[in-house]
């Protein structure tokens, strides 16, 4: 009898570790529901460096705006344990892309969320196509299609 195992490798674009602060707790001792959005924002910094490596944040270099965010709270998180934030690119379109995040604590998925980022011209106030060289860099970190979100 032959056994076949199928392994799936998912590249993590970025992984950061957060040490929750005392002020991140609610009165029940859980991490407050407003906090993961801030952690995900910190994790997106590496994605933003694809477009503006020095993070100069000028309208000439940083032509991105956030159009939509959403979060699903899957399990509780607590103050005294580190949180790992994993970040991928889950979709690349013509003018926008989606960043997908997961917050893990003690081996448990606790929060998952995404942010739609639009390539934007601040002078014309219109979305613009993502430059091909930036798309290629984003594609290097694309979550495989077979991965379930």
Feature map (PLM): residue ranges:
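Terminal targeting signals and extreme-terminal segments of soluble enzymes
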Residues: 2-84, 92-149
């Amino acid at each position: 009898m032959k056994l076949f195992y199928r392994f799936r490798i998912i590249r993590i674009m970025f992984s950061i570790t957060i040490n929750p602060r005392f002020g991140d707790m609610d009165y029940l001792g859980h991490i407050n529901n407003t906090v993961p959005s801030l952690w995900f924002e910190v994790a997106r910094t590496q994605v933003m460096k694809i477009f503006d490596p020095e993070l100069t944040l000028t309208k000439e270099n940083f032509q991105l705006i956030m159009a939509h965010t959403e979060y699903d709270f899957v399990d509780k998180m607590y103050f005294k344990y580190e949180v790992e934030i994993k970040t991928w690119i889950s979709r690349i379109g013509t003018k926008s892309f989606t960043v997908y995040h997961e917050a893990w604590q003690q081996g448990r998925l606790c929060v998952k969320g995404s942010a739609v980022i639009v390539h934007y011209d601040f002078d014309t106030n219109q979305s613009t196509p993502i430059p091909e060289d930036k798309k290629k860099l984003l594609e290097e970190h694309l979550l495989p299609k077979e991965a379930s979100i």
